[in-house]
């Protein structure tokens, strides 16, 4: 299971721990990444042969087992798409498709060597953990749980330290407690952490003062400094990204199971927030009710020492973008015989790479992890239905999460058509709102920012549409940090355009700071509570 109450902080058993501490150094390798021997299957990895879900007799039915053929696919456009020949899936069958957003490495031999090294590394996460997450997401699809997914726009090597990881984890815990009380349902906490490095770019090159260099694609590909050395894609960065991901998740496991996530501690943090918030009166009532509930539970014997009160479940996620790296961390699970991408529990395909006949969709259709699909107002309803058919032909609950990113007004117009199309097709999905990407603007100073009011408006539109359609709002997906940055304007502790430059630290897109994130969780909790009380009164 993931970072759960059933695991221990110092266990090194395969079904509980991440990786053992060992040197992770590249070695001389011979196997070619883009060789003609692309039909080689991933070997069984003996160290994870005993890794499975808590109930080893529960063999999940997931989208595609290895050696099964893909359904006919089409391009993700509104025009009729050409038929795609059925092919068997293999861990490297994506190479036969058009792959967008991949960097061009000048040193292919070094890339092959690094990928072979990573292929021999231990998995970062395990199959049983991903299956547990899929089960939880299946509950969210039915309206019986709520997904809270958040973290950095892009993780960086420079800002990698324990305090930053702790602060983001802490704010997710605080938000989760607020949402859980408001909705009276489990909250599935998934971090955009321990692997969210790579970023898609609208242009492969950037030009300044007549100098043209490759675009910055994330710290696992190249550096953000505008010089030839930094911008040249470096395969060794993949090794560092792996090590940082493993170390991050190792620390998260310790936080989740070592008492840091104790419910009483979390609620005290929330009470402190309401004391210092300009709109504290609005949120103090909810925080006080949580405090009263905890007092009742303690009186009933459910004290701080009980595992359920001092531990939590937590999963990791990132965009499936850098396919060579993802392939190198794909392992076959001995319990089910299915392939899992062991770089994260949950992966999503982005707006720029979700072509029905593209390499990213080809790779994702064959792995058994729960998957997300980023959807903008440009998504045609029929194309979405086809994409879901490809990725989840057996229609398994929890397998597919639709992450909508449209802006408030577009949400009210476009989302109903997507919901109706998916419902007509009988497909089971978890609907999630990403209120960040559709609300990016440029400030007068030239920096990108996102108005808190626009983010809040999109969340409200998301709930309004689901109320109107009789469907379930299954969660939120946020770019956020536990730091006191000034990247998004607005919020109760008002950040203005003039404030942006004071603590603008993002390596990519603007993030909600700790206060703004928690404020948004109180707003969502109020909406969940109204929805719950409304359903009870019917």
Swiss-Prot record:
GO cellular component, one term: chloroplast
Catalytic function, reaction form: D-erythrose 4-phosphate + phosphoenolpyruvate + H2O = 7-phospho-2-dehydro-3-deoxy-D-arabino-heptonate + phosphate
Main EC class the enzyme belongs to: transferase
Transit peptide start-stop: 1-74
GO biological process annotation, one example: chorismate biosynthetic process
GO MF term list: 3-deoxy-7-phosphoheptulonate synthase activity
Biased composition (Low complexity): 68-82
Entry-annotated residues carrying Blocked amino end (Thr): 75
Residue span of region Disordered: 55-82
Locations listed in the record: Plastid, Chloroplast
Notes on how activity is controlled: Activation by tryptophan (a hysteretic factor).
EC number: 2.5.1.54
Keywords: Amino-acid biosynthesis, Aromatic amino acid biosynthesis, Chloroplast, Plastid, Transferase, Transit peptide
Pathway: Metabolic intermediate biosynthesis; chorismate biosynthesis; chorismate from D-erythrose 4-phosphate and phosphoenolpyruvate: step 1/7
Induction: By the herbicide glyphosate and wounding.
Record has Chloroplast as a keyword: yes
Family from the record: Belongs to the class-II DAHP synthase family.
Protein's recorded name: Phospho-2-dehydro-3-deoxyheptonate aldolase 1, chloroplastic
Species of the source: Solanum tuberosum (Potato)
